[in-house]
């Protein structure tokens, strides 16, 4: 370092003796202008070669923008870091003095980088430490999983043992059930036999009751004849003629009943009734020998002077539900004097039940299609039914069979009704006609024509020969059954009329239609009295209570709705049916109400 300083001083001292060469500026510019691009490139290449020779080979790897490149640490930096890390400060100073001296004198080769193996070892140590931690965590998880698996295995063994025990109990129960079935099968014939005996006894009981009523009526008639001041010759007449002469209305009904039950039908004196050509032009066959007469003197309504309290419909609730049919129950009929109900069903049968217990008395099978109409004889000794097979059948309870079948209708029959004398049955059909059947003659008395659509329902005015019909042509007509003439037609419904019914006095007529509208008509003034809207669902059938102040309506929404006939106010709404209610009836004694519906049931409300 001292020698270098002396040389510098000597150069500075000799600056004044240095001879400078004059350089022309213009000549320098000419030299610059003479250089071309190739010379510049050659010089640049030479300079680059010298730099590469001085610093070592340069990396030619291009680095993409955004890419991070890790450059290895040079050897001297590595050693410094090592000395400092280990606390060898004096060693580090000696190393730096010797390192920089060798570098200044040019005796030191180009510095190299630290081999990557050290860095790789450090990274691997970190990875090993991480893997050891993960291994410890995995061992912990495996331990917990093993404990859970042991728990599940124990539970599996427990449930497997429990399942085996349940299977053994099941097999034991199946064995016991099989034994019970075999044991029950031994008693089944006995049960069937007892059931048949029970049904036979119930039928015999009913027959005896009917026979008792007939004998009581005959005894009363004979007592009246015996007490009346009649000649002896007239007293010696037969029981049937005596009852007709001295028994009044009951005697006439009894005589008609006896003829119908015993089958003592006089031969017909002529052909069937002539068909009508219009509502006002129907032609009656007229009274003939062997035919029932509807021209008897008018009978006074026995209820005209009686007053009954209104049915307590607000207090009614569902008492019992009976499911005695396989299909929809379409109609109902109550016995005139006994607590007996008949139901007509789509399963081609009618069934008789004792109310209010619901015990089955008998079942009528014979129709080839559904049964829609049923009605009791006024004396309660026989039953009329009609249905989809276009037949009207008369069933005798004493003989326990069908005694007469009328097949003049061309299409299905919707309704059948007995006249109050019991010798004539009216039927309404899908063939647009109403036919009157003469039971003594066993033939069709006349056909009432005039409706232009199906006759859905009909009702006799109590103790008269007037017949009301409801039709799908939106009209309600009243017919004189003696002359076969239409005496009155009521207009006002906007849809098919489904049902018609009279009150007990015959002074008021109710009609229902498919719009849910119920209209009340005064039969004396032949005018509409009130209109009741039951809702958007069709109203099927209606029935007055014995006071005439309450009207029950069977609706398609599964409800029975009771209205006041004076102001049309809803008094009660009986909900219980699961489908449409088809028919409804009040008990003649005013104790309960019966309804039937498309849910295959009939229900008792009390």
From Swiss-Prot:
What Pfam families does the record point to?
WD40 (PF00400)
Q: Which UniProt keywords apply?
A: Cell projection, Cilium, Flagellum, Repeat, WD repeat
Q: Where is this region: Disordered?
A: 229-250
The region annotated as signal peptide is none
User: Listed GO cellular component terms?
Assistant: motile cilium
From the UniProt record, list the WD repeat ranges. 324-354, 366-396, 408-438, 450-480, 492-522, 534-564, 576-606
Cellular compartment(s): Cell projection, Cilium, Flagellum
Q: How does it assemble?
A: Inter-microtubule bridges in flagella.
| PANTHER family named among the record's database cross-references | SPERM-ASSOCIATED ANTIGEN 16 PROTEIN (PTHR14604:SF3), WD40 REPEAT PF20 (PTHR14604)
What is the name of this protein? Flagellar WD repeat-containing protein Pf20
> Can you name the source organism?
Chlamydomonas reinhardtii (Chlamydomonas smithii)
What gene name is listed for this protein?
Answer: PF20
């Amino acid at each position: 370092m001292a020698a270098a300083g002396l040389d510098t001083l000597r150069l500075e001292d000799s600056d004044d003796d240095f001879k400078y060469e004059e350089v022309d500026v213009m000549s320098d510019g000419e030299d610059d202008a003479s250089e071309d691009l190739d010379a510049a490139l050659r010089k640049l290449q030479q300079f680059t070669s010298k730099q590469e020779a001085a610093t070592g080979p340069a990396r030619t790897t291009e680095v993409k923008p955004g890419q991070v490149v890790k450059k290895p640490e040079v050897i001297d930096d590595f050693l410094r870091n090592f000395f400092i890390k280990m606390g060898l400060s004096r060693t580090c100073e000696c190393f730096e003095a010797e390192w920089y001296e060798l570098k200044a004198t040019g005796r030191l080769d180009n510095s190299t980088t630290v081999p990557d193996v050290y860095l790789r070892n450090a990274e691997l140590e970190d990875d090993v430490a991480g893997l050891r931690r993960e291994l410890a965590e995995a061992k912990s998880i495996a331990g917990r999983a093993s404990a859970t698996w042991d728990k599940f295995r124990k539970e599996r063994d427990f449930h497997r043992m429990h399942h085996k025990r349940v299977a053994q109990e099941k097999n034991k129960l199946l064995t016991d059930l099989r034994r019970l079935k075999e044991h029950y099968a031994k008693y089944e014939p006995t049960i069937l036999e007892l059931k048949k005996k029970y049904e036979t006894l119930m039928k015999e009981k009913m027959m005896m009751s009917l026979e008792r009523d007939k004998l009581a009526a005959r005894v009363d008639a004979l007592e009246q004849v015996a007490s009346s001041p009649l000649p002896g010759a007239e007293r010696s007449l037969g029981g049937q003629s005596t009852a007709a002469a001295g028994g009044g209305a009951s005697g006439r009904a009894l005589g008609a009943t006896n003829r119908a039950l015993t089958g003592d039908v006089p031969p017909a004196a002529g052909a069937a009734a002539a068909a009508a050509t219009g509502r006002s032009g129907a032609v009656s066959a007229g009274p003939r020998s062997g035919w029932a007469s509807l021209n008897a003197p008018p009978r006074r309504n026995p209820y005209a002077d009686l007053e009954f309290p209104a049915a307590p419909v607000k207090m009614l609730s569902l008492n019992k539900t009976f499911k005695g049919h396989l299909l929809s129950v379409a109609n109902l009929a109550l016995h005139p004097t006994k607590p007996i109900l008949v139901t007509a069903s789509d399963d081609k049968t009618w069934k008789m039940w004792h109310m209010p217990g619901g015990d089955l008395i008998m079942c009528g099978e014979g129709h080839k299609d559904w049964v829609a109409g049923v009605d009791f004889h006024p004396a309660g000794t026989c039953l009329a039914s009609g249905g989809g097979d276009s037949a009207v059948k008369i069933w005798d309870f004493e003989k326990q069979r069908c005694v007469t079948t009328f097949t003049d209708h061309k299409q299905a029959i919707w309704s059948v009704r007995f006249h109050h004398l019991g010798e004539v049955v009216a039927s309404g059909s899908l063939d647009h006609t109403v036919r009157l059947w003469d039971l003594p003659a066993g033939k069709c008395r006349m056909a009432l024509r005039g409706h232009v659509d199906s006759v859905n329902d009909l009702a006799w005015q109590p103790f008269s020969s007037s017949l009301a019909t409801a039709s799908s042509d939106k009209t309600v007509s009243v017919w004189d059954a003696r002359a076969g003439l239409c005496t009155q037609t009521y207009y006002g419904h906007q849809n098919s009329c489904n049902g018609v019914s009279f009150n007990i006095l015959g002074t008021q007529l109710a009609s229902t239609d498919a719009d849910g509208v119920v209209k009340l008509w005064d039969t004396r003034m032949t005018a509409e009295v009130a209109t009741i809207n039951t809702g958007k669902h069709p109203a099927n059938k209606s029935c007055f209570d014995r006071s005439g102040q309450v009207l029950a309506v069977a609706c398609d929404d599964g409800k029975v709705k009771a209205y006041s006939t004076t102001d049309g106010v809803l008094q009660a709404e009986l909900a219980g049916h699961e489908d449409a209610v088809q028919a409804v009836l009040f008990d003649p004694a005013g104790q309960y109400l019966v309804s039937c519906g498309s849910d295959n049931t009939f229900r008792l409300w009390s």
